[in-house]
Amino acid sequence: MNHPAPPAATRRPLPPAMLDALRAAFGERVSTADAVRAHHGRDESPFDPQLPDAVVFARSTDDVREVVSLCSLYSVPLIPYGAGSSLEGHLLAVRGGVSLDLSEMNRVLSINAEDLTVTVEPGITRKALNEALRDTGLFFPIDPGADASIGGMTATRASGTNAVRYGTMRENVLGLTAVLADGRVVKTGSRARKSSAGYDLTRLFVGSEGTLGVITEITLRLHPLPEAVSAAICTFPTMGDAVRTVIETIQIGVPIARVEFVDALAVRSINRHSNLTLTEAPTLFFEFHGTEAGVKEQAELVQALAGQNAGQGFEWATRPEDRTRLWSARHNAYFAMLQLKPGCRAVTTDVCVPISQLAACVEETEVDLRASSLPCPIVGHVGDGNFHVAILIDPDKPEELAEAEHINDRIVERALRLGGTCTGEHGVGLHKMRFLPKEHGDTAIDTMRAIKLALDPRNLMNPGKIFTC
């Protein structure tokens, strides 16, 4: 369908001596089985699978050091693997090599409730982490929808439905441990809430997509569970009406915890997938956190703003089971949308624009989508200016892929013109590489490349991602 790999000459077989060394060190935790390689050679991106030559399952930082050191010794590429939920081709072994599966590194290493921090291994998922925190009165709020691994969320600088209130991984990672391309271990940051000590290496690794090293520990900021939580939904005649409600809500300072947008087509898919009966119209999902009085005040204010923008059917969901059902439906929207076109794949956009430009960006995008022959539902974390179009294509029809990429190009060009970015939370991977020079300029890309080659001079760490070396 879509072929991201460099010419075949850039791939070479895994040296037999290295495979022997891996098996001697890790035994059955090394696999060259076709099924295992196939599982680790694809993600949720529209690209064709690109399989690694071997998969190693790590259980500790020492394991990671051993694998990285062998890759360095034999000049073999290495691709970190978490939960496999990437949408941009991060996990594809475009030059072969070793896929390093971190899913068994899934422990909570320490909880410091007084400091509101936790240190975890990269393979733990968001849901598992919050389950471990359940009795502390604290939670980790970053919620990308998929039950992604914390390591993958860190590597892509992810965000999600709660970003409007709690920020992204950029704000919530306090420090980390990473294994560099030569096997050395670097520790960054601290548990302190601020520091002026030297370069901010934590931020350098957050969003590096496995190209600078393998993250093996992450220290995260936690937040107290709110006293009261309430959710609501509201429908609108047009997408512009819904988006203007969000803009006004943000601009007057209402501290909403979540605000999600879904268009009519996305609502239709959610209804089918989750057995709901939501009105098939542009819809906002809200959530409010705070005291009982504060939540009530926030919700009433937002309801009034929605009414001024032709919002209708403002419905509350105060019982936990009702809120859970509502947000589960939103979190499953990606897979619900795929069911609109059985057998399809999705080309997913991820632009983010200044909140003042969100209405213009969404409304202009709507014009493009109306002219397309492809199903193109829209969802988004519109509270921070981020929205996604899932362009559904038949993987066996190249003309549909070409149309999808044309739509994607127009959306990205529009976002950049409006002062935004090509990717708000999914990362660059393979799919967004071509947009980076337009967004940042050649000098910035050259600076990024210089950092990459200073830490990984042979380009072994997840090569072929973000930019070429």
Language model feature labels by segment:
Residues 1-469:
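Noncatalytic alpha-helical scaffold of FAD-dependent oxidoreductases
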